[in-house]
Design a protein with these regions (language model features):
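Residues at the starts of beta-strands that form the adenosine-phosphate
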Residues: 2, 51-55, 78
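Histidine-anchored nucleotide/phosphate-binding helix
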Residues: 37-48
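A glycine-rich helix N-cap at a beta->alpha junction
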Residues: 65-98, 102
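Glycine-rich phosphate-binding loop signature in dinucleotide/nucleotide-binding domains
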Residues: 103-110
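Short Gly/Thr/Asp-enriched flexible loops that form oxyanion-binding sites at enzyme active sites
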Residues: 122-137
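Electrostatically charged, flexible surface regions
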Residues: 143-254
Length: 254
């Protein structure tokens, strides 16, 4: 089995800044492997058996290799970085087009394609569905568990108020929620192995993409404004022994 996991390096969301065009300003902001991506990687590693492989891929600047290196430390078998100045400013559509191009260049279709359910910096949760649509693949959201079953996979989807068990054919796209997936800690030996592993870099030309189909030029949407939302809450304590005050408060609510 070949498992393909798309991951993302995200800035520390507590230190995020936004430029005048509404794009995230990543320079100087500490970055981490997106926690949702790690859930997807862990599920792929749990599925992997002898003879299987887990490939991780991310689109980003050169420093995104740190997230891929972390994936290799956790247990991934190989890693690819999709990096090109032309990719900058991509919306979810242009990002999905780039990731889809990688799948099409990957050779034989992966048995399963996995994403985190969303990214901590954008929270759109759109890319998995868009990639599935572009590939013509089945897509399953809120997956907490998966295991091989016959010619495909049995996946569990947790919607909060409802849990479903479905049959997913090979080549499906999964959006993975945390569920009961246990995080693993890499050994010292694995750290050393991962530090010596090659991270392959592919640019726009290697993926066969035109300059106007990627990044800001290939985006279908434009960010008008982006920023942090700050909320303040106040609390009013009403003495329950004073019916008049309680009545005044209730009238104020309506």
């Amino acid at each position: 089995m070949r498992y393909l996991v798309f991951v993302k390096q995200v800035p520390d969301t507590t230190l995020i800044e936004v430029d005048e065009q509404g794009n995230l300003r990543r320079e100087g902001v500490p970055s981490i492997l997106d926690p949702y991506s790690e859930h997807a990687l862990e599920l792929a590693l749990n599925l992997r058996s002898e003879g299987d492989s887990v490939t991780v891929v991310t689109m980003g600047p050169p420093q995104a290799t740190a997230a891929l290196r972390r994936c290799l430390e956790i247990g991934a078998d190989e890693a690819y970085l999709l990096s090109d100045r032309a990719f900058a400013g991509a919306d979810t559509y242009a990002t999905s087009r780039t990731l889809t191009a990688f799948v099409e260049k990957f050779g034989e279709c992966p048995d399963l394609i996995l994403f985190g359910k969303q990214a901590a910096d954008g929270d759109t949760a759109q890319v998995p569905a868009e990639v599935a649509e572009m590939l013509g693949a089945d897509q399953f959201y809120y997956v907490t568990k998966a295991e091989p079953s016959g010619e495909g996979f049995e996946v569990v989807q947790d919607y909060g108020d409802e849990v479903r068990t479905c049959r997913a054919p090979k080549g499906s796209v999964l959006s993975v929620s945390e569920g009961d997936i246990n995080r693993r800690l890499p050994s010292i030996e694995r750290y050393l192995q991962a530090s010596a592993m090659e991270i392959k870099v592919l640019d726009r030309i290697a993926l066969g993409l035109g300059n106007f189909s990627v990044g800001n030029k290939g985006s279908r949407t434009k960010i008008v404004r982006s920023g942090s939302v700050r909320s303040e809450r106040s609390c009013t304590v009403v003495d329950g022994s004073d019916p008049a005050k309680a009545a005044t408060l209730i009238r104020g609510l309506f």
